[in-house]
Amino acid sequence: MSIHQVMRYLPHRYPFLLVDRVTDFKPGEYLEAIKNVSINEPYFQGHFPIRPVMPGVLIMEALAQATGLLAFKTEEARNENQDKQQLYLFVGIDEARFRRQVEPGDQLHLRVELLRVVRGIWRFKAEARVNGDLVASATLMCAGKEIES
């Protein structure tokens, strides 16, 4: 899924769109995506000027955006909510862990797996890797919200 297709599903735009491409997915199961981390990212001006590091909360946000994409693709495959405009909102995070810093030039590989959906709350296992090394992980939750045009 190209960036143009990603933008059809996610409402985020620069500088807050944190998924550059979806490399693989299976509706109802998993989604894999990448975020290319560039020195031109606006947050590097202040985090940290001497040694730029991607903020951990933005790594989690990138993973959360990937969960939204998987939720959209899953509902699309099930032919659910096709006639409604919907957003997936980030509603929870458990067991977040950060294992190493992400720096300019890194390519962040995102993988989210759907664990279950209970009463409209989608629960995912989420991992971010750089060069195969785990840099962050968490259990993330999102919920669909119908929006009016």
Curated annotation (Swiss-Prot):
UniProt-annotated catalytic positions: H47
Pfam families per record: FabA
SUPFAM superfamilies referenced in this protein's UniProt entry, alphabetically: Thioesterase/thiol ester dehydrase-isomerase (SSF54637)
Coiled coil: none
One function term, GO molecular function aspect: (3R)-hydroxyacyl-[acyl-carrier-protein] dehydratase activity
UniProt EC number: 4.2.1.59
UniProt catalytic activity: a (3R)-hydroxyacyl-[ACP] = a (2E)-enoyl-[ACP] + H2O
Top enzyme class: lyase
Broad class of the protein's primary localization: cytoplasm
Localization: Cytoplasm
This protein's GO CC annotations: cytoplasm; membrane
Keywords linked to the UniProt accession: Cytoplasm, Lipid A biosynthesis, Lipid biosynthesis, Lipid metabolism, Lyase
Lineage top rank: taxon: Bacteria
GO aspect biological process, one term: fatty acid biosynthetic process
PANTHER family found in the cross-reference section: 3-HYDROXYACYL-[ACYL-CARRIER-PROTEIN] DEHYDRATASE
Function text: Involved in unsaturated fatty acids biosynthesis. Catalyzes the dehydration of short chain beta-hydroxyacyl-ACPs and long chain saturated and unsaturated beta-hydroxyacyl-ACPs.
Family under the similarity heading: Belongs to the thioester dehydratase family. FabZ subfamily.
Protein name: 3-hydroxyacyl-[acyl-carrier-protein] dehydratase FabZ
Organism: Thioalkalivibrio sulfidiphilus (strain HL-EbGR7)
Gene that specifies this protein: fabZ
